[in-house]
Amino acid sequence: MSFRRKKFCAFDAKNLQEIDYKDVNTLKDYIMESGRVVPSRITGTCAKHQRQISRAIKLARYLALLPYCDTHQ
């Protein structure tokens, strides 16, 4: 029997209501080296903020603030 660790949402702890797409340094923490969005089971963010993170990353990519992938192979 395994016990799951309680999720800890960093955005709830900071009382952030909205995740800004212009805050590139924060968004980079939630992107893998391959360019994929890190899942919430790894980051521990709640579902509400995970959706906001993915929307902000997609918008920042569209506006060329973030790359779609770091390495092209």
Swiss-Prot record:
One of its GO terms (cellular component) is cytosolic small ribosomal subunit. GO terms for biological process: translation. SUPFAM superfamilies: Ribosomal protein S18. One of its GO terms (molecular function) is small ribosomal subunit rRNA binding. It holds the Pfam family Ribosomal_S18. Keywords: Ribonucleoprotein, Ribosomal protein, RNA-binding, rRNA-binding. The keyword rRNA-binding applies. The keyword Metal-binding does not apply. Signal peptide: none annotated. Binds as a heterodimer with protein bS6 to the central domain of the 16S rRNA, where it helps stabilize the platform of the 30S subunit. Belongs to the bacterial ribosomal protein bS18 family. Part of the 30S ribosomal subunit. Forms a tight heterodimer with protein bS6. This is Small ribosomal subunit protein bS18. The lineage of its organism: Bacteria, Pseudomonadati, Pseudomonadota, Gammaproteobacteria, Legionellales.
